Amino acid sequence: MEFLWAPLLGLCCSLAAADRHTVFWNSSEPKFWNEDYTVHVRLNDYLDIICPHYEDDSVAEAAMERYTLYLVEREQYQLCQPQSKDQVRWQCNQPNARHGPEKLSEKFQRFTPFTLGKEFKEGHSYYYISKPIHHQEDQCLKLKVTVSGKITHSPQAHANPQEKRLPADDPEVQVLHSIGHSAAPRLSPLAWAVLLLPFLLLQTS
């Protein structure tokens, strides 16, 4: 039974190590007033988008903020213009929901079991923009998410920086390996007979 606890313990540790980053997606959020609103995450972290929500009737329903969020490329992020409907990630479309504000979550994982899931890589940035549903004004809210890479350690002091690595030591280099027998030249039976013939004649004389 103790072997069954090992993977469960590892899963719990990985979940405990993951952080959640909350973004309130509405025009009143001061962080959106800057052009470079950026969130830094690590693999297996979560991004929680909190949609606009109104608890009373002080705002007319037609004026309640609703957004379509897109996951786009850097150029489209800069222009705040999605390229296609295939880039739609979520919709914030229930501003007066009784259960409270909608929460939309993204997990930054390297691999996903879902066909339509998104896979993320360390050292890369990803871009979210939105277009308003509640009015036709070109109001753009955008967010940049950077997946931080692993911490790299500096080389040891005694290591020789001029020392060259052999191709076989570099996993990225394709090394040709011989297959079958050794590539060294082999003598045929006739050649062996010619070489041994003088010794045989000396033994019989």
UniProtKB/Swiss-Prot annotation:
- Bilayer-crossing residues are none
Propeptide positions: the record gives: 183-205
- Supply the InterPro entries for this chain: Cupredoxin (IPR008972), Ephrin (IPR031328), Ephrin-A_Ecto (IPR034252), Ephrin_CS (IPR019765), Ephrin_RBD (IPR001799)
| Protein localization | Cell membrane
Glycan attachment points: N26
Q: In what residue span(s) does the Ephrin RBD domain sit?
A: 19-151
GO biological process terms held by the UniProt record: angiogenesis; axon guidance; ephrin receptor signaling pathway; negative regulation of dendritic spine morphogenesis; regulation of peptidyl-tyrosine phosphorylation
Keyword hit for Lipoprotein: yes
Kindly indicate where the leader peptide sits in this chain: 1-18
What is known about its processing and modification?
A: Undergoes proteolysis by a metalloprotease to give rise to a soluble monomeric form.
Could you list the residues that carry lipid attachment of the GPI-anchor amidated serine kind. Answer: S182
SUPFAM superfamilies referenced in this protein's UniProt entry, alphabetically: Cupredoxins
Q: What does this protein do?
A: Cell surface GPI-bound ligand for Eph receptors, a family of receptor tyrosine kinases which are crucial for migration, repulsion and adhesion during neuronal, vascular and epithelial development. Binds promiscuously Eph receptors residing on adjacent cells, leading to contact-dependent bidirectional signaling into neighboring cells. Plays an important role in angiogenesis and tumor neovascularization. The recruitment of VAV2, VAV3 and PI3-kinase p85 subunit by phosphorylated EPHA2 is critical for EFNA1-induced RAC1 GTPase activation and vascular endothelial cell migration and assembly.
On subunit structure and binding partners, the annotation says: Monomer. Homodimer. Forms heterodimers with EPHA2. Binds to the receptor tyrosine kinases EPHA2, EPHA3, EPHA4, EPHA5, EPHA6 and EPHA7. Also binds with low affinity to EPHA1.
Q: What is this protein called?
A: Ephrin-A1
Q: Which organism is it from?
A: Sus scrofa
